[in-house]
Regions:
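Catalytic cores of phosphodiester-bond hydrolases, prominently lipid phosphodiesterases
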Residues: 2-8, 15-398, 404-422
Length: 423
């Protein structure tokens, strides 16, 4: 094809591409692909058969934490931190050392705290619609995020030998080997001895966990992992943050599919112990209903941790490829304290529906919000019945986490001209 013909073709495509915007008209997230002859990204609509497990009775895990007959973790000693304790002659010492930023959390069970979570935490890439966060994981943790989620894929269309954090396809967004990101988390945990962090690994290819474990161990993070005494863990089985901190078991790790807690008791099976509201939500009402695991009874759901997915999406279709992208034009509203579609309203609705607040508010671009940046932390504090300090430092916000949609046809023009295309 001649250059003039290519230019004509690209020019003709531009209106078509621009017409692909969907709801929330100001949203302008774009996909930029790299590599040659990339396979078309596909979205799994259902996991493999047998992916969800249920248990008629608890299994005691070998090598797990010591526990009482009631199933609660026991520990010796107190959270003694020198100058961070105050005491009088007539009262017991009073702890003033915060756990996960709040003194009140130290004596609360892990299952009785609402954390702010970063949906697709590793996916930080300016100008790429595969991104879900603006600030890297160290900044996320510094600002108060205590739940991190990321999807694992094998690069090279599944032929790679090192698992990476990738968004649907490693040709869409490749955040690198999993041990790099996990190593950053481990380094942060090293420096913050009074914080408990939860990591949810998405098993994008439904691989056997034995393929991931060596790379998880390579990061050094396993020295901090929490090993539960039972499978599954009910709400009352969880220890307090203070107990976890005293034992140095300050990283809770889940795998969404194909977990094997018999072999790896610390890599916990998510859906036998946690349920989630609808994933990739496109409804601003954010119904607080159980989507995964399917067919979970309300009685069973009330005795599990739960994640409130509050990352609003739109579906973007271009050249036959369907992508879910963040509704960035509504980020401040979605991550706001009050109002239609806000995380604060949704958390309160969940609390009313289930009699307790969500354990995780899972959001995109956590540092956006209203009435101020980082309002998601104030929303979490409200349902935790603690007071958020607005003077806490929080990451700066750039002009926008996206690239304007008018440049999409230019991107595809470059792909066509340079021989990069999607097959």
């Amino acid at each position: 094809m001649k250059w003039s013909a290519i230019a004509t073709t690209v020019a003709a495509l531009a209106p078509t591409v621009l017409a692909q915007t969907v709801e929330y008209g100001a949203t302008s997230a774009l996909a930029f692909y790299t590599g040659t002859r990339t396979s078309k990204p596909t979205r799994e609509t259902s996991p493999p058969s047998g992916a969800y497990h249920s248990y008629a009775s608890k299994i005691t895990l070998i090598g797990a934490n010591s526990s009482t007959s009631a199933g609660t973790t026991t520990s010796t000693g107190t959270l003694s931190m020198g100058a961070n304790f105050t005491a009088t002659t007539s009262s017991a010492p009073k702890n003033t050392q915060p756990c996960n930023k709040y003194v009140e959390f130290c004596t609360r069970k892990y299952s009785n705290i609402t954390n702010v979570g970063c949906h697709n935490s590793p996916f930080v890439r300016p100008g790429n619609s595969g991104s879900n966060q603006e600030l890297d994981v160290t900044a996320q943790l510094n600002d108060g995020v205590r739940f991190l989620q990321g999807q694992i894929q094998w690069p090279g269309n599944g032929t790679g030998t090192v698992p990476h954090f990738c968004h649907t396809s490693c040709d869409l967004l490749d955040a690198g080997p999993i041990y790099d990101w996990l190593g950053q988390v481990r380094a942060w945990v090293d420096r913050h001895p009074y914080d408990v962090v939860t990591i949810l690994l998405g098993n994008g290819n439904y691989s056997d966990p034995s393929l991931y474990v060596p790379f998880i161990e390579q990061s050094g993070i396993t020295k901090y992992v929490y090993t539960p005494p039972f499978l599954p863990m009910a709400l009352d089985d969880w220890p307090t943050l203070q107990e976890m901190i005293l034992k140095g078991q300050r990283v809770v790790m889940f795998l969404d599919y194909q977990a094997n807690q018999t072999n790896y008791p610390w890599l916990m099976d998510e859906f036998s112990q946690v349920w989630e509201t609808p994933f990739d939500p496109m409804d601003r009402a954010f119904p607080c209903t159980v989507q995964r695991p399917p067919d979970l009874s309300k009685e069973a759901a009330k005795d599990r941790l739960y994640i409130m997915n509050h990352n609003l999406n739109v579906e973007f279709n271009v050249f036959g490829i369907s992508l879910m992208v963040p509704a960035v034009s509504l980020l401040n509203d979605t991550n706001g304290i009050n109002g239609t579609g806000s995380v604060g309203l949704a958390a309160n609705n969940c609390r009313e529906d289930w009699g307790r607040a969500p354990n995780v508010l899972n959001v995109d671009y956590f540092n956006y919000g209203s009435p101020k940046p980082c309002s998601v932390f104030a929303a979490a504090a409200a349902v935790n019945n603690v007071t958020y300090d607005w003077d806490n430092p929080c990451g700066e916000i750039s002009a926008a986490p996206i690239v304007m949609i008018t440049s999409l046809w230019v991107t595809f023009a470059a792909m066509i001209i340079t021989g990069l295309w999607i097959s």
